[in-house]
Design a protein with these regions (language model features):
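Rossmann-fold dinucleotide-binding core
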Residues: 7-96
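Short alpha-helical "patches" and their helix-cap loops
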Residues: 51-61, 141, 213-222
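Short, small-residue-biased leader/transition segments that mark boundaries at the very start
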Residues: 2-6
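Secondary-structure boundary/capping motif
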Residues: 36-37, 135, 198-199
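C-terminal helical cap and adjacent loop that interface with cofactors, partners, or active-site loops
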Residues: 21, 164-222
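Predominant activation on well-ordered alpha-helical scaffold segments within soluble catalytic domains
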Residues: 38-45, 93-97, 140, 144, ...
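C-terminal substrate-binding/catalytic lobe of Rossmann-fold NAD(P)-dependent oxidoreductases
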Residues: 52-53, 62-188
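Residue-level signal for short, function-critical loop segments
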Residues: 32, 131, 194
Length: 222
């Protein structure tokens, strides 16, 4: 039945489940918003840091709405425009919440609000993580260490800020992490191409791992 199928699937976020993907036969490839959001918070979830809440302010290029929406005039509607949607709930929030709580091991209050921006492609997530205590953590080192073996994730230094132009048409994710001016809060910015790292590119990564190829085969950015 469907329940058995669900139990057999492996969540296809390579930065989280690389070993499980290698032996899997059924992969659930993450959505574009969950990919950017989860890559932004994963290093904080299993380091003994107590997270009180996560606020994800996410923006997407119009291709995220699908080809039909673009052909039906969305590109004209959003030109020189900017708007939120899914305010009452978005289908990707349960996916984000499930993985965050699975990795952290405890319930975390998560608020997620997506927006459409006047660009064709790209996901840009600004993530506010409220911690119980910063505990003098070196966040730059924490993120660098977590993603040291992840070929498609780049942790930027504190003087740099991700954008969507630099990751367009690539399978990369750029991340910055900084302390907020609010006590015990961290601001993480994560950017990906919704059509590559947020979709087809990630599926290729999973295929490569399942069949013994290098994770980045066919995805190298020339």
């Amino acid at each position: 039945g469907l329940g058995d199928v669900y139990k057999r699937q492996v969540y296809g976020l390579t930065e989280l489940n690389q070993d499980k993907i290698k032996s899997a036969r059924l992969i659930a490839v993450p959505g574009c918003y969950p990919t950017a959001s989860l890559l932004g918070v994963l290093p904080l979830l299993n380091k003994g840091v107590q997270i009180e809440s996560i606020l994800i302010d996410a923006k997407s290029g119009i291709s995220g709405a699908g080809r039909k929406a673009v052909e039906n005039g969305l590109s004209v509607e959003i030109n020189e425009n900017f708007k939120a949607y899914g305010i009452q709930g978005h289908r990707h929030l349960p996916e984000i919440t499930e993985i965050v709580e699975l990795v952290s091991g405890y319930p975390i209050s998560i608020n997620f609000l997506p927006h459409l921006i006047p660009a064709m492609r790209g996901i840009y997530s600004t993530i506010y993580v409220q911690l119980k205590d910063l505990e003098n953590l070196d966040f730059q080192n924490l993120y660098d260490s977590y993603y040291t073996d992840s070929p498609n994730v780049r942790i930027m230094n504190s003087e740099e800020v991700p954008d969507i132009k630099s990751i367009a048409n690539t399978n990369n994710c750029n991340i910055s992490v900084n302390k907020s001016n609010i006590e015990n809060q961290v601001i993480v910015i994560s950017s990906i191409d919704n059509l590559v790292k947020g979709a087809a590119g990630q599926a290729v990564e999973c295929y490569n791992l399942m069949y013994g190829f290098n994770q980045s085969t066919g995805l190298d950015n020339g």
